[in-house]
Amino acid sequence: MTCDIKLTYIDDKLDPLLVDYLYTISENEHIFEYDEYNFDSSKDSYQSLLENTNIASSDIIIVDSKLFENEFADSKSKFTGQELKIIYAIANPFIKIIVITQNNDLSKYGVIKKFATSRECSGREQEEANKYYDNVLRKEIETLIKNVKEVRNVGQLLSENILSYEDSLIVEKANNLISKIPSYKDLTDEKINELIDLVKKDIEENND
């Protein structure tokens, strides 16, 4: 059985317990198609993620808060999952973003804490991780799946009533976004940098 909801997990170091949790749900329950992307700070940036067709075809993205480990990485690669969430809110607000973290102090930003893993993953630890993610992540995923389906239903209504909106560029753009037809003409580097600066400033102020 296949599913038309696609969930992609993005991390600079994919968490094996989370990977197993998401993959098992995908294989056993078929509520989403699972994919993953290993972020490489030596070559990746927010622009490369936006332009990656596999990621752009996702309905839900789970992304790590800190997408870089190398302190000498290109500055364009140094951005957080929170920043990516804001960027996607402009690039395509119909792609839903869940931000996860190993830190304890980001819940105020709607960030979900990862299960604390040890150096070696055991069967027992996987069971504990599954229970943890069932409590903190599962409901969020199910809610977003419901939202995606609702948006698609509205998009279908727009398509059926196309004659009523034939002169509306807004409706055309909405349909294109729902259909994952990208358009980044209005998403300039200047606008993106302004958004990133705002997020960074807010995080720094709250960490003081």
Language-model regions, residue ranges each:
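A general structural motif
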Residues: T2-D4, A56-S58, F94
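Conserved acidic segment of CheY-like receiver
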Residues: C3-S26
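A short acidic (Asp/Glu
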Residues: P16-Y21, Y46, E71-S77, S107-K113
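Short, surface-exposed basic-aromatic patches at helix termini and helix-loop junctions that form
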Residues: L22-E29, E51-I55, K85-P93, V111-T117
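Short hydrophobic/Thr-rich beta-strand motif most characteristic of the beta2 strand and flanking loop
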Residues: I31-D44
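Conserved phosphotransfer microenvironments
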Residues: K43-A91, Q102
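Alpha4 helix (beta4-alpha4-beta5 surface) of REC/receiver domains from two-component response regulators
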Residues: N92-R152
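C-terminal output/effector regions of signal-responsive regulators
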Residues: E142-D208
